[in-house]
């Protein structure tokens, strides 16, 4: 425990919170260009082929971004919007691609949770 005199000389330091998504630079989303679109396998105990793209952002950062939903239309040079949010079973993937924005299409035949996948309301 510090004495009053010590605290007068040198006040307590507040801990600095480290950002989980440094490439966004405090923005909600960032635009970027796909440099590589590929699939990768998750950590144990999961098994799948997860769709991921490498994105060069407008601020110069290059990050890996997860492509959620069933099927996608992304290829090299596609312009995408990314948001924060990591994928727990893919090491190094700390961003998500926003579906239905810029060159990314929404998920086809999606009925529930449509807003998360950029799908329009189906004609009843």
Curated annotation (Swiss-Prot):
The modification 3-methylthioaspartic acid is found at residue 89. GO terms for cellular component: small ribosomal subunit. GO terms for biological process: translation. PROSITE patterns: RIBOSOMAL_S12. Residues 1-23, 101-124 are annotated as: Disordered. Residues 111-124 have a biased composition (Basic residues). It comes from the Bacteria. GO terms for molecular function: rRNA binding; structural constituent of ribosome; tRNA binding. Keywords: Methylation, Ribonucleoprotein, Ribosomal protein, RNA-binding, rRNA-binding, tRNA-binding. PANTHER family: 30S RIBOSOMAL PROTEIN S12 FAMILY MEMBER. Belongs to the universal ribosomal protein uS12 family. Part of the 30S ribosomal subunit. Contacts proteins S8 and S17. May interact with IF1 in the 30S initiation complex. With S4 and S5 plays an important role in translational accuracy. Interacts with and stabilizes bases of the 16S rRNA that are involved in tRNA selection in the A site and with the mRNA backbone. Located at the interface of the 30S and 50S subunits, it traverses the body of the 30S subunit contacting proteins on the other side and probably holding the rRNA structure together. The combined cluster of proteins S8, S12 and S17 appears to hold together the shoulder and platform of the 30S subunit. This is Small ribosomal subunit protein uS12. The gene is rpsL.
